[in-house]
Amino acid sequence: MFYFPVEYFLQVYSLPLIGEVRFQKDYFSEYPEQIRVGSDGYDGLRLRTAVSYIRKPGYYAVHYNQPGTVAIGAILRLNDGAIAVFSGEPNQSEQGILSPVYTLESNASLAVPTGLIFIRFAESVDVESQREVINQAGYEVAQSLSYAPHTAWLRAKSGKIVDAIAGISQLEAIANVKSVEPQMLMERGLR
């Protein structure tokens, strides 16, 4: 038989000291853990169902100022290379805006928020007539759609993605709003 002194056993199998335990930093704690889009119930003749995006730890996205940026080590490139998704912890020296990565609850596809929010009013309500209310909610019209004057793409006045997502409930509270959804870019899939 072979015997080990108890001291050696305790050194090998003991837990690390509290000071040595490192908790992974949550770089995106200001972002919601879940983003719920849509609603349950009837919208006209078709049934709309709610979709949930869940924040995925261990991944982050870098939003570059120009498309086509070479992103070494990226696991996914979106929007012609303007957004790159990486695994691991973000490097604070990254040249670009950092954001979290979400997964679509139903199929675990990676999704990245862009900071744009799509708003749709009742068809009788023109977005231009609601510009002041939109501004009071902390948003500005980024793009009006001439073929659908009751819809528009919005962005937070601050320009921050986190502010755009955080204010969705304020937009939903505006009278005659039918739908508010953040733009979430995902890898193109074949059907």
Language-model features and meaning:
Residues 2-191:
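Primarily auto-inhibitory N-terminal propeptides
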